[in-house]
Amino acid sequence: MNQQTFTQPKAQNLNLLAVIGFNGGVIDGLILHPDNETLIFPIGSQIVVRNVLSRQDRFLKGHTNDISTLTVSNSGRYLASGQKTFSGFKADIILWDLTTLSIVNRFSIHKFLIQSLSFSYNDKYLVSLGGIEDNFIIVWEIETGKPLCCNTAGSDFVHQVKFFNNSDNKIVTCQNFGIKIWTVDYIEKKVSSVDVNFGNLKRKILCMIIDPKDKFAYVGTETGDILEIDLQIAIYKRIGPVKRLFPQGINCIKLLPNKDLLLGSKEGIIAKINFNDFRIKKEGKVLGGVTSMTLTTECAYFFCGTEQSNIYWVETASLKSEIRNTCHNDRVNDIHFPYEYSGVFGTCGKEDIRIWNTETRQEHLRIHVPNIECYCFDFMRDGKSIYSGWNDGKIRTFLPQSGKLLYAINECHANGVTAICATSDGRKIVSGGMNGEIRVWKIGNQSQTMETSLKEHRGRVFSIVINSQNDRAVSASADGSCIIWDIINYVRTACLFERTLFKQIVYHPEESQILTTGTNKKITYWDVTDYTEIRSVDATLEGSVNSLSMFNSGEFFVSAGDDREVKIWEYDTSIPRFKGLGHSNPINKVIVAPNQEIICSVSEDGSIFIFATPKETRVAKRDLRKPQ
């Protein structure tokens, strides 16, 4: 047995082709650039710059953790982004040049979280607002990158900060139960504030918009109403909408050229409010609480982003919406391609299974099962059905074209079906549960019966694989064991032990060896003939390795895990040759497409990353040696 120590090799970076995802939880995080063609939004620690006409994506990488806020300057040249980090640590603000997609400057004074950012109308200054642990307002000079003045935002938590539209020394902040109007003295380098007089009215203010002449501000509250603020005399003027509130609160608000107000609520309602009498003129509904609205230059249409990570295209006049992009808004548990077909792939997570087009990255089909979570799924070898395991203990099989339920096997496992695999002929399904049971199901034309229940594991079963002969199954469990089962006679033939929680197991294409991985940060090679350990490789310095996938040639394999990196390893030498970066959350699964051209990975934040595979990994070395 050979133990290899971990030394960080120089691995080449993989080319990131596309990302399916959108962090809908970032307030005003979906921004349409002034050129009317570029859509900007965050995914984890990256910023996606997408051309809405060609759907070409470019990526801005520089943050070390999830992005918390975005803003674009009036000229469209600059983009400022802030991130969240850990308690007590500094959170970065990055200033980007959108013409070159490069970093202009990096500001690091705030702690834990950047709550809000705003540019002055002339692109000279940037104001930043820290989160609840910081609560400071800092004004930065863009040309020099230096902070000019700083002040605490007050005792209440501040939600948003904005520059006036025609002045670079006037700032407004909205906070719990108040609004402050700030004046910046650039000569003395200090900031002073005036509180807006609300009288006896108390509201928790979440968002605001300032009119083009800087006379009034309109703010949305957690109570679900809108307040008009006179910025000249710092006093509250009126309240609306008349005879109607939005119970869960107003997340974002926009001002139309005719002075009508456009608002988005936490319950998914888009409403247009008449400026004169504050009555609702039009109303629409989208899926998920509205967190972003970004208008086109003509204001005839706007993009709308929601908490459920959906992006809608909405007509301003009628408020009729059509969905343009969608993705998982919670962790993705599994990903698979159909057998020898790379045109589509499937993912599963909370409440649904989704089928995606590989080329367009659009959702083809969504199989929705409310209030439960899908832990695992796969396509039958013949492509005629999708079988899946859920946390209610059922195995459900669906038709791949319509998503219609074909059959369900009830009470398969007490606390959920956590791993599942079918034989190549589709006549048997082997499932594993949260409590460690392995059960074999016979699948007939009209019936599904349990053949046997094998109780050897004492912890959750994370992975099951079946060999090409359909007579052996290997299960990996959190109890530190991998068991090889004879699924003809239903007996245990061998057992592998390690001090780890096994996360996944894969066969080498020749089925002479198997690879295992888990929480011990290692990838272990095992011989199938006598089930002895061949060697163990330190695969990461951080967390566990959660997933493995083999290339068809058997000369390379892919790993991914808590270190948020996708790594391509050379099988014989156990050296990582390539790595894919971009994920900001632990990666749950990774898979190589059947055509060997792309690698797909899914993570805890619901994003799907698609990397291009290097040419040298697509063709086996033995094929390169063949005469042409």
Region annotations inferred by a language model:
Residues G25-I31, D66-T71, F112-S118, D156-F163, ...:
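Canonical WD40 repeat/beta-propeller blade segments in eukaryotic WD-repeat proteins
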Residues F6-G25, L53-D57, S192-S193:
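A short helix->beta-strand "capping" segment at the edge of beta-propeller domains
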Residues V48-N51, K90-W96, I137-E141, V161, ...:
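WD40-repeat beta-propellers
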Residues Q3-K10, K189, V196-F198, L501, ...:
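Terminal intrinsically disordered, low-complexity extensions flanking WD-repeat/beta-propeller proteins
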Residues L17-S45:
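Beta-strand-rich domains and repeat architectures in extracellular enzymes and scaffolds
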Residues N36-T38, D57, R77-G82, K124-S128, ...:
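Structural hallmark of WD40 beta-propellers
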Residues A18-I20, D57-G62, I103-I109, P147-A153, ...:
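Short C-terminal beta-strands that terminate individual repeats in beta-propeller domains
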Residues I43, G82-T85, F89, L129-E133, ...:
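Conserved strand-to-loop turn within each blade of WD40 beta-propeller repeats
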